[in-house]
A protein has these predicted regions:
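Polytopic transmembrane helical bundles with strong interfacial aromatic enrichment
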Residues: 1-471
């Protein structure tokens, strides 16, 4: 907000005439969030036990609610710049702030950022747990921060699985609002940034799965499922390679002549959206399968129909994957564009049915199950902690990249088709320059996070008074 006021005072002045009321509430909510955070943090020990623990829980929930409201208000300002509403063609405000807030892209980006922030929050907590685990001085501390890291990774995975769907929904709404904006997003210069995005999201999936596989070492019964890990890894890597395969290659004139065109004859078809939709759905399903194996690792089913239940689950996964492949291949390559685009919806529904159905059935199969042995918290290799670090770094870089794309598709407009950016810097930078700026921003943010970790470490160290000051 400070840089917006400093570098774009005219834009801020225009936005403040429209959103002055919401900006007032934004300031109030900011102070409310700070107050709740202080009480939550400094009342940590005071609010333990009895009725006070419920007050502590309520403060934590209130902190999340206030933070979400802040995000929703800020989202209304940025989406107004992309899909202005409540103003006439000349940009004159009609007086209805709610109409400006409730613009075409407000709800799609609310959903996308809400899910993304849950995943991102889990990754940051996981990174903190990894840091504390690696610096722990006792087995008890290692066990505690191992447990903390697992729960943080669980939250991140739960939000990561629906995140691609929320992103596709947002992109579809952008197309619906403005085809020019949609074409710029996926078919123009920004298309190559989505290749980088695919690499980052693939990194997230591989890191999350790797952590789960390492975490199976906590259980004495994990050896029953470790033999399947290599097959899951092969599928994930294969889907990852399909996901970031570009449709059009960046080539020199000599390479273009040698290849016979900008498209690779074999790999080119993997660069279009039907292949990528298929790949991401397969990655999501196999990530859910990894989590199911982790949950099962320390359990022994006691129900009489366990074999039948397992057979149903295998059939569900097999049928779901075959259906996703059929929809992606047949409708993606052998039908017209209408069916090609529409096929993504039943693919998503298939993925949801497979995951929800299999986990629901699994809960019944392992109801009243026996434990193989108590979980050995802290019995996890240190390299798994670096997977948690990678999750946090990749999420930070990804959020910076997608924020740039979201702003960049407005091109030379501050507010699309209303307020033009007439400055000398109103141009789309090269991909390399944009990537460097995002990298610097990610490094600065991660440095701030590391500083917070260090402050927390310093505040936990207590030194007994000695000498003159000792009482």
């Amino acid at each position: 907000l400070f840089f917006l006021i400093l570098f774009y005072p005219h834009l801020f002045g225009y936005l403040s005439t429209i959103f002055s009321e919401s900006m007032f509430y934004y300031a109030l909510l900011f102070f409310a969030e700070s107050a709740v955070l202080y009480i939550y943090y400094y009342g940590w020990h005071w609010l333990q036990g009895g009725i006070r623990k419920w007050i502590h829980l309520g403060l934590g929930l209130s902190l999340n609610v206030v933070g979400t409201c802040l995000m929703l208000l800020a989202n209304s300002w940025l989406t107004f710049m992309m899909s202005p509403a409540g103003v006439d063609a000349a940009g004159v405000f009609g007086g209805d702030t709610w109409a400006a807030m409730n613009n075409f892209l407000w709800h799609p980006i609310n959903i996308h950022r809400f899910v993304a922030n849950i995943a991102y929050g889990g990754s940051i907590v996981g990174a903190y747990a990894a840091f504390k685990f690696l610096t722990a001085g006792s087995q008890e501390e290692r066990a505690h921060y191992d447990w903390m890291g697992y729960n943080a990774n669980f939250i991140a995975i739960c939000a990561l699985l629906p995140l691609p769907f929320a992103g596709y929904y947002l992109a579809a709404e952008m197309y619906l609002y403005s085809q020019q904006m949609g074409i710029t997003l996926m078919g123009g210069i920004f298309a190559w940034l989505f290749i980088i995005q695919a690499v980052l999201i693939g990194t997230l999936f591989l890191s999350a799965n790797y952590y789960l596989w390492c975490g199976m070492g906590r259980s004495d019964g994990a050896k029953r499922y470790t033999k399947y890990i290599k097959y899951i890894a092969i599928v994930l890597v294969g889907a990852f390679l399909v996901w970031f395969t570009p449709h059009t290659l960046v080539l020199t004139n000599e390479e273009l002549k040698a290849l016979g065109g900008p498209h690779h004859k074999i790999l080119g078809p993997l660069g279009i959206m039907p292949a990528k939709n298929t790949a991401v759905n397969v990655m999501i399903i196999f990530t859910a399968l990894s989590f199911m194996f982790y949950r099962r690792a320390n359990k022994v089913a006691t129900v009489s129909w366990v074999n039948a239940g397992n057979a149903i689950q295998v059939a569900l996964f097999t049928a779901g994957i075959l259906n996703i492949m059929f929809l992606g291949i047949y409708h993606g390559y052998f039908t017209n564009t209408v069916y090609k685009v529409a096929a993504s919806i039943p693919q998503v529904l298939t993925t949801v049915v497979v995951i929800v159905g299999s986990i629901t059935l699994d809960s019944f199969i392992y109801k009243n199950s026996k434990e193989v042995a108590p979980l050995h918290w802290g019995r996890i290799p240190g390299r798994a902690m670096y997977a948690l670090f990678l999750l946090a770094v990749a999420f930070t870089w990804l959020m910076g990249l997608m924020g740039y794309i979201r702003s960049g598709i407005r091109q030379h407009w501050h507010v699309l088709d209303i307020m033009r950016d007439g400055s000398v810097d109103a141009f789309t930078p090269t991909l390399g320059f944009a990537a460097n700026v995002v990298s610097v921003a990610a490094i600065i943010f991660m440095a701030m996070v590391i500083f917070v970790f260090w402050i927390a470490q310093v505040s936990s160290n207590k030194t007994l008074p000695s000498g003159y000051w000792k009482e």
